Amino acid sequence: LSLVGSEMCIRDSHSIGAGCFIAEIQQTSNVTYRIYDFNRKDKNGNTRELHTELSKDAIDYSVEEDYRTHYTPKQNESVELVTCPYFTTSVYDLTENMTIDYSELDSFVIYICMEGTCTVTDGDGNSLELQAGESILFPATTKEVKVTVEGHVKFLETYV
């Protein structure tokens, strides 16, 4: 089963296999249930505490027929993937430069580059090159971002 290039929103418990590129976007929480920890040690050389019994109570055991996020890909515009009470995530697939307006948004914004390279420039003129596998967080004071494309770029945009 190949899910290369698939976007999905898995709302509950999960595990991550080798070779996966995962953008784990989630609501704020101070809870982590560690089920298996690969025998890692804490700063004192002890194995870290596992939360096997607690995690069993938190797992949603229902099975989804299709957990992929279905959307119609579009070039050079925002396509919303997920909106929930905790965050909104959209995908941009750009071959042209774009200025994105955040003047009405009262949130930080995160870009996660999935393919290609671009230069992002905020309203104050601060610029940074963003490549596949890299992320950038813009503070809530950012009013606009100019994305200068170098051929093609695909990135996720997330805000609360």
Outline where the language-model segments fall.
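Short, well-ordered loop/turn sites that connect or cap secondary structure elements
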Residues: 6-7, 16, 113, 130
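C-terminal amphipathic alpha-helical segment
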Residues: 33-105
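Active-site pocket scaffolds in enzymes
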Residues: 122, 137-140
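Ligand-binding loop in jelly-roll beta-barrel domains
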Residues: 11-31, 140-160
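Conserved hydrophobic/aromatic beta-strand scaffold that supports enzyme active sites
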Residues: 22-24, 89-91, 110, 135-137
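Single conserved hydrophobic/aromatic residue that forms the stacking wall/gate
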Residues: 1-5, 9-10
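Glycine- and acidic-residue-biased ligand/ion/polar-headgroup-sensing regions
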Residues: 96-123
